[in-house]
Amino acid sequence: MKKAVHFGAGNIGRGFIGEILSKNGFEIYFVDTNKAIIDELNTRHSYEIGIASSSPEKISVSGVFGINNGENPKDVIEAIAQADIVTTAIGPNILPYIAELVAKGIQKRKEENKQVQIDIIACENMIGGSEFLEKKVAEYLSDSDKVYLANYIGFPNAAVDRIVPGQKHEDLLYVEVEPFCEWVIDESQIKNKSFKLEGVHYASNLEPFIERKLFSVNSGHATVAYSSAYKGYKTILEGLQHKEILSALKGVQKETRALLLAKWPQYFTEEDLMSYHQMIISRFANPKIIDEVTRVARTPIRKLGYDERFIRPIRELNERGLSYQNHLDIVGKIFAYQDENDSQSVQLQEKLSTMDFQRLIEEVTGLSNKKIILEIELVIKKYKNDSK
């Protein structure tokens, strides 16, 4: 039986990547530091996924195991050495922390003279996630290790899309997900061409698809979250009932369409993107998915990053002389976002009260364009004054 090592036994790992790998006949070794979940996986070797729709169904995933990388790092290294595929769903910020283990797994494959090619795929909400992980892994490799990596280890980038809300169940392993899911892998970067995963789309050029996803789903979800937080709503579903919030989402979507059509006219049409964006609205409005605003809005500093879901579209729209006022408005709401249980929100509010705004904008967003920095400063002041 083929073996998969998956870093991250959380809701996305179990409720999306695990489902696809299981359907493709893999034994799955989930790697995580959550002792309770790892122990439960090793006790039961199976779990259920609930599909949240008007016709609910349950999917059983079996042939699963858990490895606690905090307690048993050697077992992780051995699992990577024996794996046919390695995947991650741990969050962009955590990728550097698994790099050394992945490197040791690659070194063990080399020591055992394994000449079977393997792909390591970061399934994260970021552009170039697998390439980023490869760079971090390479920091732990010798020159001869790097030669082996170049020949036998692929790091194809991927785009993943499925809404998995925050949730708690009596059953530790049970997870509810929306019906829709999309996993796209850059075919040009694949090393192991002996199989293709069913349920996965392979693209010769991933970039247009990952930008469509990040600038539509992630930007859109965040638009609803920060707009809802500003109005005092607790869930995404509640917020979307408000005309102003739906209008804000549609405004961001309109600007996103303009950018995607300007960048990728050979891949998308206005009609395609309109249909895609309407589908996204219906996904966000799924009455069976109760998604907390605090979950979608968490880590605001990360979401204000230079290549993230708002600043990158703003930069690229500005370069093309296209409007980005709706994106800009949400940036103001992100700076105004307050959640005492979110360390980044607390940190951002502290900086707002102590730092010069323009210097703070430069620090958080990485922007150097004075025009955009000034525009962001004005929208920060607007929402700061409104909240008083």
Curated annotation (Swiss-Prot):
Transmembrane helix in keyword set: no
Q: Which GO terms describe its molecular function?
A: mannitol-1-phosphate 5-dehydrogenase activity
**TM ranges:** none
- EC numbers on record: 1.1.1.17
SUPFAM superfamilies for this protein: 6-phosphogluconate dehydrogenase C-terminal domain-like, NAD(P)-binding Rossmann-fold domains
Q: Which InterPro entries match?
A: 6-PGluconate_DH-like_C_sf, 6PGD_dom2, Mannitol_1_phos_5_DH, Mannitol_DH, Mannitol_DH_C, Mannitol_DH_CS, Mannitol_DH_N, NAD(P)-bd_dom_sf
**EC category:** oxidoreductase
What Gene Ontology cellular-component terms does the record carry? cytosol
User: Which Pfam families does this entry report, sorted A to Z?
Assistant: Mannitol_dh, Mannitol_dh_C
Biological process GO annotation list? mannitol catabolic process
Q: Which residues bind NAD(+)?
A: 4-15
- Substrates-to-products reaction catalysed: D-mannitol 1-phosphate + NAD(+) = beta-D-fructose 6-phosphate + NADH + H(+)
UniProt keyword list: NAD, Oxidoreductase
- Taxonomically, which superkingdom? Bacteria
The family line of this record is:
Belongs to the mannitol dehydrogenase family.
Against HAMAP family, the record matches this protein to: Mannitol_dehydrog
Q: What is this protein called?
A: Mannitol-1-phosphate 5-dehydrogenase
Q: Which organism is it from?
A: Lactococcus lactis subsp. cremoris (strain MG1363)
